């Protein structure tokens, strides 16, 4: 995991008896010294915090105060209130009940024993306030305000991602911000409920636990803790017994292999959608324009192809990749092969730089990876060395990749069992190959089925059905709609007597000719199953071919069969 943010509570976590010790301050300074951002998340009011911790402005990149109702950026001395000021009617009702309290910019603070009286005052006045406990303290917060909402505002302002964040706390009011942390840590003397929900509990209490965690884990990018973070695993599908098939969100190096038109793109699309659904950022290099439909999902931007948005230059890409909520699909389908390789290499160089600085994008997916990382070697391979970031390479066969890339995977998925075994052999050697064979049953994969091998520890194989995609997949859209297929893959309208010789080298030309030939020619090819065979075998679209085959069995007349065939092709490929 790339830890770029360390968010901590104050009282009972880094501070004991109001103050931060010298040892704790030095540990926190070491975190910032590595370039990581240090955020303080506290229930205290800002003036009170600055009184008990005079070095707060120097120590922290941002402060979430008043339990999320106020945020403060020390470098620019900027304060933002995120909730309504305390209502005068509420304050008067509390005074009448003898409740002692302090007033912040948006918070009312008192002691836990006065909870009943505070709730009575809220009911009487009808204001929207939430009671939040912090051990012996009680806070009356504006509705919807938590430490989590305040921290989210800070992360947004600093363009940081919670998926690169560790959070540590000790009390009831820390639940919200720990829940949004990629790794939630509780000190050993935290309240029981917080310890139960945490991903990790320190051995030592309070500030000593924080120092322990920083020295043992934060400065090492959580390498020993990442395997525990199973709540973040991405579900690719399920086995026959409904067991989910997952890959870790962090540090996964996934290789997807298999012959053309067997479902690799579908499996890759499932992975991409699961990454996006989890709120992580994605960069997808798309040589054939297969993944443009991902733009239908929120926060996904497609560049290149025949679209309105040109591919970004390296400096523009550098800026785009630094937005944690934005994912990019770079469609290279309008380029020549040499141009694709050159541009992709520049993209990988920029991505390596941005990832080192920010941990973004969380996933890098390279389709047709053998073009950029060929078996004979490539300078681009040096830009993809093992790290904490996740990577997916998609290719026909492992042998098509540079040797270093064959050994890179921690997980291999395939739509063909033979290709899977070859990839495992390339990655781990004969011993692991025998192990994976022993774990699989040796049967060929059925259509719509895939297999996956986890290589990190004891290699094992599982057969599974990939999950359902949310958006329509259009395979090699530009290539088949506007490119030029060779004669042996083109469709020829010859008619029942063979007197015609009209070549359709792509789908756009096919639609044009099919719409213009006489009915006898159209019906001849329809009844002979020629359309079905071409769509299945040359366009590599078995789903559309199956639809047309269904029409062939329905006994449609010439005019209606032509209309329905064209309607389905146009709907699928927008030609």
Task: Describe the residue ranges of each PLM region.
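P-loop NTPase catalytic phosphate-binding loop
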Residues: 230-363, 373-392, 396-400, 405-408
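Short, structured coil segments at secondary-structure junctions
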Residues: 56-59, 67, 125-126, 180-181, ...
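Conserved ATP-driven motor cores of ASCE-family P-loop NTPases powering translocation/secretion/packaging/pilus
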Residues: 58, 390, 397-458
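Mg2+-dependent phosphoryl-transfer enzymes with acidic/Ser/Thr/Gly-rich catalytic loops
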Residues: 1-5, 21, 141, 148-230
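Conserved acidic, metal-coordinating active-site core of Asp-based
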Residues: 87-181
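Active-site phosphate-binding/coordination module
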Residues: 17-106
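Terminal, compositionally biased segments used for targeting/anchoring and flexible tails
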Residues: 438-575
